[in-house]
Structures are given as structure tokens and as C-alpha cells.
Regions:
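Catalytic cores of enzyme domains
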Residues: 169, 182-373, 382
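Glycine-rich phosphate/diphosphate-binding loops that line cofactor/substrate pockets in enzymes
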Residues: 67-83, 106-107, 284-285
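Short glycine-rich or small-residue beta-strand-to-loop segments that form or flank ligand, phosphate
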Residues: 81-92, 113-120, 410
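Histidine-anchored nucleotide/phosphate-binding helix
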Residues: 92-112
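Active-site histidine-anchored catalytic micro-motif
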Residues: 95, 111-127, 158
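An acidic, phosphate/nucleotide-engaging active-site surface
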Residues: 128-192
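C-terminal non-catalytic interaction/assembly regions of soluble proteins
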Residues: 3-8, 15-30, 307-439
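N-terminal amphipathic/basic leader segments beginning at the initiator methionine
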Residues: 2-62
Length: 439
């Protein structure tokens, strides 16, 4: 800022000119581009993809109840208060899962209640986190337990190198905590344990300060802090255990496993993480010119779109995947459950006005800020164009392939739903074994 210059004048006229201020209203309307008159969007063929299809769990509630009772029978004393972690992710059958966990703990004599265990999500506000649970169907009536929400935290332990461990005030007052989460590869770091029960215990239950101190560092240190954190937290005796679920590429629950305190962050969770990696859906093409994603959101991935699928991590110190090599990404929508939080919008290159209008920048920036180095590039604004068709045409025009060459285009529902995709003719000869073109 130049001394004595108003904010609105800081750029305009800086060199004695009368340049108009930035026209933000142009983004609201969407910028129109001069597309080649002969540009056409290629026709796409629907393809069923070969993905792992383990047997789904038919009754998630009963499975959760049974595994809790079987694994934790000797660890619960009558009247033990247990803070059960409810997350912001769109777990399949999440209400049934929590209800089964609650009933299982009650059957053992515990007195469970639910706390939002989601770091800074929900705008880093207690009412926002409660609202996020409710938007996912996790109301007190549905899960059969009281929900206690607060952003106040209590330091309960420190790692050997001095990092504090936090629990929210309600969880800290309980006899034990019990994280319940989907286990899957993480979007910011790689290790023996990534996203799952351990991360919810160390990060989710720690609210804003717990999340901020983990995400403040790079990918390798992030992994180490989480692993060291669970050791320190376990040593306090505050962890009863947890429940981890694994979903297939089609979004069906295929495993529900209760973990003891020793299992959380231990061999059992490592085994579940290895299994979860096998379930991660993949784009079966080494090079893609245009990837069209119909919807992203916090219930799909913490980063709106899962970089383990798109190949783009956009984190300093963490390399993008060699395959798929995606030239341009078009994101068409975000889910209502996201509440406008669009962390990860920076993965996209083009978005329509209809999506841009949904973004709550307060929520997005708070979440990105808490994510530290992982949030810097992921909050960048893509090109905003009037319509979905404009976005796709822009991607086709700017993907780096000559105008008269066939484009390698893939369209998916989301990075979580990958049992099928739609591809252009240029990719039909590269379909993997077992893929089936839908007539």
C-alpha cells in the first residue's frame, strides 16, 4: 500500500494513471471468452470401470453394535462417560454407524454422548459444527444421544518434543474419548496411518488449535506429529478405542471394525489403512486433457476433490502423482452439505458462476488457514465463467492439445463415486481390462 493512499486506490493510479479498480462484478457475471466458432464439445461414452467389489455390510448399525461389544467388553466400566466423535465427512450410513456405536457402548454400561470432532470445520464455530452434523443427518433424535458442541479446548498431554495435545472441553471432561471415522489415504501426507481414527483423535477432537498445529507443518512433519500425538494421547488413558469404517469405490461400507486403545494408531489401524488403499478409486488413464468433475464437497473429500484420484496435491513438499497426468480440471458444483466451504477449489482450473456463488469465503479461508501449508494453493480461485458449457470449452481450448487434435476427456460424478465414467472417443482404445462400454 502506498502511504496516504486509500485501499481502493492502491492499484489504480499507482503510477499516475487513472486505471479503473478491479471489476469484481465481472466474476459475478462470469467472464465471456472468444471461443473458436468451430469448437465442439466431444461426445462421451459411458464406461463401467473395473473396481474392487468386496461384499458390502448389509446392516451397518448391527455390525457397529456387535464389533463394539465384542472388542471392548473388558475395557468399559459401568457409568463410564464416553465422548464419541462425530465427523464432518459424508460417511456412508453414518447415522446407522453412530447409532450402532452408541447402542454398543450403552450395552457395555457406558454413558455415551457425541461431540463434533472436526477441527476447524463449520467455520470454527460451535453452532456451525453442530449444524454440520445435523446437515449430515446426525441429529440427537437420529443417533439416540446428546450432542455437546464447543470450540473451547483443554490441553491434556504433550509429546516428547513438547507439542501440546488438546481435547474439546466436553471431551476432556469425559472419562474416555471414542473417535468414529472412515479410514482412507490422506490428502496431505503419506504414512502407515493416514486419515482415520488416529487423525480424528489427534486433530478432530483438538478443534482449531489441535488442527492448526498439525497442519502448520509440511507433509512429513504432519505425519510425524500425528503419530507422536496418538502415542502421547494414549498414554493419558483417555482413549477407550474407536471404530473405523472402509468404503468401496462404489461408496458401500465393506468393513466396520472396533479398535481398542492399543489398536488406535497401532497394528490394527495400519492393516485397515493398507486395505483402504486397495479400495481407492483410480482414473485408469495415464494422460487426460480435460477432467470434468460433476460435484465436489466436504462430504466427498476434505479437499472437495480427492487428490489421490485427480493426481493434484498442490502442497509444497508433496509431489503430484505421475499418473494420472491431468492437464485441466473443470468442477461444476459443490454439495449442499459443504455449507459453502470450498477448500480445494484451487484444484480446479475452471468453475461456473453457479458454483462460485455458493462459496462461503469466510468458511473456506478459515479452513485453509487452519490447514497451513496444505491450504495455501488449494484456496486459489479458478477461472469463473458464465456456464458449465463455457468452462468445458475453455478447458478444451487451453488443455495444450492442438485445436484439430482429438481431446482426451473424462467426466466423473465425483472423486468418491468412481464405478463409472464418461470418456471421449480418443480414450476408448485405452480402456483397462474389464471395463465395459454402456450401449
Amino acid at each position: 500500500m502506498f502511504p496516504g493512499r486509500k485501499a481502493s486506490e492502491s492499484a489504480a493510479g499507482a503510477f499516475g494513471t487513472t486505471v479503473a479498480s478491479v471489476k469484481w462484478d465481472q466474476l459475478v457475471q462470469g467472464v465471456e471468452l472468444p471461443f473458436h466458432p468451430d469448437l465442439k464439445v466431444p461426445a462421451l461414452s459411458e464406461v463401467l470401470l473395473p473396481v474392487p467389489r468386496p461384499e458390502r455390510i448389509a446392516d451397518v448399525e448391527q455390525s457397529a453394535h456387535a464389533t463394539v461389544v465384542a472388542r471392548l467388553a473388558g475395557d468399559v466400566t459401568p457409568g463410564m462417560t464416553v465422548a464419541v466423535g462425530g465427523g464432518s465427512r459424508g460417511l456412508t450410513d453414518r447415522v446407522l454407524l453412530l447409532r450402532g456405536v452408541i447402542s454398543g457402548l450403552r450395552a457395555l454400561g457406558a454413558e455415551p454422548f457425541v461431540v463434533p470432532a472436526m477441527g476447524s470445520h463449520g467455520g470454527a464455530k460451535a453452532e456451525g459444527q453442530r449444524a454440520m452434523l445435523e446437515s449430515l443427518g446426525m441429529t440427537e433424535e437420529a443417533i439416540g444421544a446428546e450432542i455437546r458442541a464447543t470450540m473451547e479446548t483443554v490441553e491434556v498431554a504433550r509429546t516428547e518434543d513438547g507439542m501440546p495435545l488438546y481435547l474439546d472441553r466436553h471431551a476432556a471432561r469425559a472419562d474416555r474419548i471414542f473417535p468414529v471415522n472412515r479410514i482412507k489415504p490422506h490428502t496431505c501426507f503419506k504414512g502407515p496411518i493416514e486419515s482415520g481414527v488416529t487423525k480424528m483423535a489427534v486433530v478432530g477432537f483438538g478443534k482449531q488449535p489441535g488442527a492448526a498445529q498439525i497442519h502448520a507443518c509440511g507433509p512429513e512433519e504432519m505425519r510425524n506429529r500425528i503419530l507422536n500425538g496418538i502415542e502421547a494421547l494414549r498414554a493419558t488413558g483417555r482413549i477407550l478405542g474407536g471404530v473405523g469404517t472402509i468404503e468401496s469405490a462404489s461408496g458401500e461400507v465393506v468393513r466396520v471394525e472396533a479398535l481398542t486403545a492399543t489398536d488406535v494408531g497401532g497394528a490394527a489401524e495400519i492393516e485397515l489403512t493398507d486395505f483402504a488403499r486397495e479400495m481407492v478409486p483410480a482414473l485408469p488413464f495415464p494422460q487426460i486433457d480435460v477432467l470434468i468433475v460433476e460435484k465436489g464437497g466436504k462430504d466427498i473429500s476434505g479437499t472437495t476433490m480427492d487428490p489421490n484420484v485427480t493426481g493434484r496435491f498442490s502442497v509444497h513438499g508433496l509431489a503430484d502423482l505421475a499418473e494420472p497426468d491431468v492437464s485441466t480440471i473443470v468442477l461444476l458444483n459443490i454439495t449442499p452439505v459443504s455449507g459453502g466451504n470450498a477448500l480445494g477449489i484451487g484444484f480446479a482450473d475452471f468453475i461456473p458462476v453457479s458454483l462460485a456463488e455458493q462459496i462461503d469465503w469466510q468458511k473456506t479461508y478459515v479452513n485453509c488457514f487452519t490447514a497451513g501449508i496444505a491450504g495455501v494453493r488449494r484456496s486459489r480461485m479458478p477461472m469463473v465463467l458464465p456456464t458449465e458449457d463455457d468452462c468445458i470449452k475453455a478447458a478444451l481450448s487451453m488443455c495444450g492439445r492442438a485445436f484439430d487434435q482429438p481431446k482426451r476427456v473424462v467426466r466423473i460424478e465425483s472423486t468418491l463415486h468412481m464405478t463409472r465414467c464418461w470418456v471421449s472417443d480418443a480414450l476408448l482404445q485405452e480402456l483397462p481390462a474389464g471395463a465395459e462400454i454402456v450401449a
